[in-house]
Design a protein with these regions (language model features):
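Conserved, mostly hydrophobic/aromatic
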Residues: 82
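Residue-level "edge-of-site" marker
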Residues: 85
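Conserved beta-strand-loop surface patch within small alpha/beta domains used
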Residues: 1-79, 88-141
Length: 141
């Protein structure tokens, strides 16, 4: 299970609406054991994918990942996952998402339809990398 505050949920939804018709993306910082984790902070990332591909792909550069690792250390948190939006597509992982994901992390996907944030889901990639499993996403007040 992944737990988000209402504030963090709102930040993700606003990022998805602002980036539309392109994908937004970012990194989730949090605490917890391997099963249940709580997101305490996030780091919005500028989608580094070439502009013609941003409507259906996102890219977080190695430099951004290093900066996020350093930020996590300063905050005494872990990188627990990532978020991105799917403009005008379901809030479910694509084959591209599976090919570029790593087990152990949470992957929040936000459906943005015609610029309006809709369904938000959480996924984890199986160790075999054959498929994602849906995870419970809890929003705290």
């Amino acid at each position: 299970m992944l737990v988000l505050s209402k504030t963090i949920e709102t930040e993700i939804r606003e990022a998805g609406a602002k980036a539309y018709p392109n994908e937004c993306c970012g990194i989730l910082f949090g605490t917890g054991d391997g099963e249940d984790q709580v997101v305490r902070s996030l780091r919005p990332i500028v989608n580094a994918r070439e502009s013609g591909e941003q409507y259906h792909r996102f890219l977080i550069t190695a430099e951004e990942m290093m900066a996020a690792e350093l930020e996590a250390r300063k905050l005494a948190l872990d990188i627990v996952g990532f978020y991105h939006s799917h403009p005008d597509h379901p809030a479910a992982p694509s084959e591209y998402d599976r090919d570029h994901a790593l087990p152990f992390y949470h992957y929040i996907i936000l459906r943005v339809a015609q610029g309006e944030p809709e369904e938000m889901t959480d996924w984890r990639l199986r160790l075999s990398r054959e498929a994602f499993d849906a995870e419970e996403l809890e929003i705290e007040p």
